[in-house]
Amino acid sequence: MSQTKQTFSTELGGRPLTIEIGQLAKQANGAALIRYGETAVLATVVASKQPKDLDFFPLTVNYEEKLYAAGKIPGGFLKREGRPGENAILTSRLIDRPIRPLFPDGFRHDIQVATTVLSSDEDNSPEVAAMIGASIALSISDIPFDGPIAGVTIGRVNGEFIINPTMSQASESDIDLQVAGTKHAVNMVEAGAKEVSEQAMLEAILLGHDVIKELIAFQEEIVAAVGQEKFAYTVASFDETLVNRLKAEALAEVTTAVQVEEKQARDLAINEVISKYIDQYAADDSITEAQLAEVSGVLNKFVKTEVRRLITEDKVRPDGRGLAEIRPLDSEIGLLPRAHGSGLFTRGQTQVLSVATLGVAGDAQIIDGLGLKAEKRFMHHYNFPPFSVGEARPMRAPGRREIGHGALGERALLPVLPSETDFPYTIRLVSEVLESNGSSSQASICGSILAMMDAGVPLKAPVAGIAMGLIKEGENYSILTDIQGMEDHLGDMDFKVAGTKDGVTALQMDMKIGGITRQILEEALEQARLGRLHILEHMNSVIAEPRVELSKYAPKIVTLKINPDKIRDVIGPGGKVINGIIDETGVKIDIDQDGTVFIASTDQDGINHARQLIEDIVREVVIGEEFDGTVRRVEKFGAFVELFKGKDALVHISELALERVGQTEDVVKLGDKLKVRVTEVDDKGRVNASHKVLLVEGMSPEDRAAYDEKKKTERDSRPPRRDTGSRPPRDGQRPPRRN
């Protein structure tokens, strides 16, 4: 790589995109600094010197968000970045998926792609910059790579498509589409949408590819200027003599084995063929040790070629289904009595138990990344234990795959959730994969819908998901509906589509080949739509509408609106007031900055009591209002009467009785009930009230006339005030102040 900084510029979505090469990370095989607006991402790639002895391609992609990029200091005791967050993991996957198919078959050098966000504004996507940066770093390096690739985000506001929408535009968009590909074809799609038609999604994908082609032409100029020659590499290959012998002796048995319909029986049949020929060739003196080590690999290659041949030529799938046929469906709800909602969805040998839990606003997840701090009130977590595929492996924390599948389900379900105003609950869904033979992520979407409907969540519409596959040999191809594990593993495409009967809510496409054409995309989307409608019909037969009542174990939530200026009164100094209410009533209370108060509990009486306490605290006292109060304090000058919890009024001694009162205790004592009327509220909120005015109004006309006459006589009999005249002038100067 050149050691002198070189700069290349273009525009993306009407904003400047600048690539700087040759200044940073010069010991990496390839490095580039991408500036997009005020967003800056460093992309580096490194390859091991020697290939690894592995049967897979060891590619690692990392996307790192440094909080200094947004002018933030990490929280916690250590004050440094910890494990990558969910967004970083999902972005790593977004970069990995389009570049992985473009490395040579059999390439076994360790490859590490690292993209680091160094600066981030709120409008220019660091994810897009990182994907472009990874492609440029690979393309200019000496690492064999059949790129470049590029990626863009497509949104749609008021029917108009937008390239790389800003944050404000994204909030109004009904499509959130990330698309990546080469100059020839699209090879990665990730999308969320608000029940958008298949045709609109196709148009968005194709628009994205048009932009991608422009970005790739820009990258090719960079490669021509600073690109390195690719290093030579060796690809492991099987012994040709062994391949030919096994083809003659074992291919027919492999063909029979791959057509066993049941998954475990099919796996057993394939393993028996492999074991048979390993044992047979181990006893054959003409077979070398090196050839014997390759027997399993050759036979597994035959498994792949035969499955693909049967599908593309004979239109026969391993389990005997037609290309567009969906496996048998079975569903059940309400399996777990103490859970708020549960749904079991089974499709063939894939089975998912989804469980819905309803929580309060305080249960929302706090998201504090490079962007603005936000709360997430809907979560979908996906778990894939080893027993689901009949394996004994360590039970570990969720990996990238589980996090990715959980996020896909979340994206698919989000558009049909009720608004927070209509349903002020935090919703957590957990999908437990109990059996897996492909399409478990889509089964988790179906199971989650069943669980939420069982929980009484008022969904706008049910959603179903289906996974499509592709087997392509030259110009000959077959699109598969509801792929099973073997078809996913040996096929060329995994295309997941989720949506309602009216439109798509999520898409995810991964390719193992260079890309696919518009025709294949169109056919796959239409085939997926028909499959989705079939699954929705089945789900509707199990539960057609969400339950009217929530589970008795779910919290009930009541909301009320208070003046935001009164929030501090409800909270109190150090939280004293609100904690007192919580302790007294046993409820949970959350308050938004706009004055919305959420009160939650399984006990309705506790909710009602807490609501009354809060309403009393924020209540505005009006002159003329009457209260049946309680005497809480007695002073020489009058009594303090509690009108309601948290609000007292002073009843002056002259306002306690009709006659003159010598001592306050002569009329009232602590704890006495006293009816009063508010006569004054000062600018500090202090209240004066009168009991006497109510006594006067309660008199009969005769008594009132006599009382008024008596008061008049008393006033007339008082001696006149002494007239002291005006104050005389001061003589001389005022004495100085005392120190």
Curated annotation (Swiss-Prot):
Its cofactor is Mg(2+). It catalyses: RNA(n+1) + phosphate = RNA(n) + a ribonucleoside 5'-diphosphate. One of its GO terms (cellular component) is cytosol. It is an enzyme of class 2 (transferase). GO terms for molecular function: 3'-5'-RNA exonuclease activity; magnesium ion binding; polyribonucleotide nucleotidyltransferase activity; RNA binding. GO terms for biological process: mRNA catabolic process; RNA processing. It holds the Pfam family PNPase. It is found in: Cytoplasm. Its EC number is 2.7.7.8. Residues 698-739 are annotated as: Disordered. SUPFAM superfamilies: Eukaryotic type KH-domain (KH-domain type I), Nucleic acid-binding proteins, Ribonuclease PH domain 2-like, Ribosomal protein S5 domain 2-like. The keyword RNA-binding applies. Residues 701-739 have a biased composition (Basic and acidic residues). Residues 624-692 form the S1 motif domain. It comes from the Bacteria. InterPro entries: ExoRNase_PH_dom1 (IPR001247), ExoRNase_PH_dom2 (IPR015847), ExoRNase_PH_dom2_sf (IPR036345), KH_dom (IPR004087), KH_dom_type_1 (IPR004088), KH_dom_type_1_sf (IPR036612), NA-bd_OB-fold (IPR012340), PNPase (IPR012162). Residues 555-614 form the KH domain. Involved in mRNA degradation. Catalyzes the phosphorolysis of single-stranded polyribonucleotides processively in the 3'- to 5'-direction. Belongs to the polyribonucleotide nucleotidyltransferase family. NCBIfam families: polynuc_phos (TIGR03591), PRK11824.1 (NF008805). This is Polyribonucleotide nucleotidyltransferase.
